[in-house]
Design a protein with these regions (language model features):
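Nucleotide phosphate-binding/pyrophosphate-handling subdomain across enzymes
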Residues: 1-86
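Short glycine-/acidic-enriched loop or helix-start segments at secondary-structure transitions
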Residues: 5, 70-71, 98-99, 149-152
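A structural signal for short coil/turn segments at secondary-structure junctions
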Residues: 17, 53, 133-134, 157
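Short glycine-rich anion-binding loops that position phosphate/pyrophosphate groups of nucleotides
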Residues: 37, 64-66, 93-95, 143-146
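Short hydrophobic segments within beta-strands
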Residues: 61, 90, 140-141
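C-terminal helical cap/extension that packs against the catalytic core
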Residues: 78-136
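A short, gly/pro- and small-residue-rich
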Residues: 104-112, 152-161
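A glycine-rich beta-strand to alpha-helix segment
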Residues: 125-156
């Protein structure tokens, strides 16, 4: 490739889908979707959000991805998510896995640091939650199917602005 071809390509490059993907960005409300589904990725997202929005309440709705990953990293997930002001945990997205007895989102919930507002919700109730609440900065985290709700979440929140 020539330098000019690269320049032209960069002009039209829109970034990676679902990596810190802003859907709404106003003074009153920020909504973004992030594919982060590993504690290190969540840590980086939480760190960036905390730096960008120092004086704003940051809420994450997180859907853990895989029972084995949740079992192996629940403390790390809790540590990374504890950088945020509020964490709303959905049920684990199983993908290709069968449930593992005793492995649920509650493992993460129980290990969130004191001071973090926390709750658990079924994915099917997320839209009702978004309708009933006001948010400052809201990030939808995970690699599961919670992302399917993002267009409707965006629509609901835009009607509130």
């Amino acid at each position: 490739r020539t330098a000019e071809e690269l320049r032209q390509g960069m002009k039209t490059y829109e970034g990676v889908v679902r990596r810190f993907d802003f859907k709404i960005k106003t003074d009153k409300l920020v909504l973004l979707s992030d594919y982060a589904h590993h504690p290190k990725e969540i840590y980086q997202s939480a760190k960036s959000l905390s730096e960008l929005y120092k004086n704003r309440k940051i809420t994450a709705i997180f859907q853990p991805h895989l029972y084995t990953r949740t079992r192996d990293f629940y403390k790390d997930f809790a540590d990374s998510l504890s950088m945020l002001d509020e964490v709303i945990l959905c049920d684990i997205y199983p993908a290709r896995e069968q449930p593992i007895p005793g492995v649920t989102s509650k493992l993460i919930y129980d290990n969130l640091k004191p001071g973090v507002e926390k709750s658990m919700i079924h994915k099917e109730d997320v839209l009702d939650l978004v309708r009933s609440r006001d948010f400052d900065v809201l990030v939808i985290l995970g690699a599961g199917d919670l992302d399917n709700y993002v267009p409707e979440i965006e629509k609901i929140l835009k009607e509130k602005i």
